């Protein structure tokens, strides 16, 4: 149900007497545990490899292929959770907002739309791969089994990261 609107920004509702198309342009944020018990990689994990495989297969490959970023987040140990003074200091929300707005403005000025809306041809023109990036992408394709769709999504994310850094081109 999510694949079509994620790809096209529209959803078609079909009933016996008619079909209606609705706009469905949205950003999907999702989270899931790494395994059914949630403790994968920890001695508390009780899941078998088969249970983990079945759990992860609940989300279809084509849907996973349409999710741009996959991030594994490690658990915070109790000492660090209780002792906030050891937490790394990052950018403030205001600083992040300014960088994101500047990156978005940069995209609109350069190409008249945000990077997520670029076609494959457009992203290839705006995200040229030098030899080092080409080697890195080849390794990523081999290691993660990227589809063509996945390849272009990586380029769009790379272009967006370059925009956040106010860089003309993505860097490896």
Segment roles from a protein language model:
Residues 2-172:
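Basic, amphipathic alpha-helical bundle interface domains used for macromolecular binding and assembly
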């Amino acid at each position: 149900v999510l694949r079509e609107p994620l790809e096209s920004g529209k959803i078609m509702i079909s009933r016996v007497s008619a079909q209606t198309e609705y706009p469905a342009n949205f950003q999907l944020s999702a989270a899931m545990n790494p395994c059914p018990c949630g403790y994968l990689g920890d001695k508390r994990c009780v899941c078998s490899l088969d249970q983990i495989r079945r759990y992860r297969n609940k989300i279809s490959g084509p849907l996973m292929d349409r999710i741009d970023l996959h991030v594994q987040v490690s658990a915070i140990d109790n000492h660090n959770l209780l002792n906030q003074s050891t937490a790394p200091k990052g950018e403030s929300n205001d600083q992040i907002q300014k960088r994101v707005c500047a990156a978005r403005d940069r995209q609109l000025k350069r190409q008249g739309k945000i990077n997520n809306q670029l076609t494959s041809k457009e992203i290839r023109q705006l995200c040229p791969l030098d030899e080092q990036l080409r080697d890195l992408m080849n390794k990523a394709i081999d290691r993660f089994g990227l589809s063509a769709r996945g390849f272009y999504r990586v380029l769009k994310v790379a272009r967006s990261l370059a925009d956040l850094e106010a860089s003309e081109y993505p860097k490896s």
